[in-house]
């Protein structure tokens, strides 16, 4: 399998942060998005950003900005589709997605995805981590390995009104790549001002 392309999902509307782009918030002198790029870029062949609105606000990243092709802010699956369409233009077979507000995700994200999806005709996998208290396994719908071969199926599902990521991935027998929780959940994301304070504390401690 060719090395996947990377797509950072930044299409959310950040309502709990008062609007704006969570990825552009400062985290120890750099934007959260910069932290995400630095973790994802070494693991993939190239990186693009899924975001809506004026792409100029991301100009410092020097990344291609891919808007949703489905109207109405339908959620992460629209960003996945935008990434798959971009990947098809690049001649790639798969993409790996990461969320723009999740700065501490695993540095072995892509290898673990490829391992989990080994042998699948259309490699498809979601990340997961286990709740430290309850032991429940939580899938992470914005962190996934997605095959270009299923992009037309995804487009049709979105046009039919499907919005929930796991409904679509379950239809196609997605694998699960489980990542350990070592001190903090690696998929901790910044949704509120309080989360940002926690993220700054984690970053200061060298996560």
Regions found by a protein language model. Name each.
Residues 1-165, 170-186, 193-207:
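Nucleotide and nucleotide-moiety/phosphate-recognizing core
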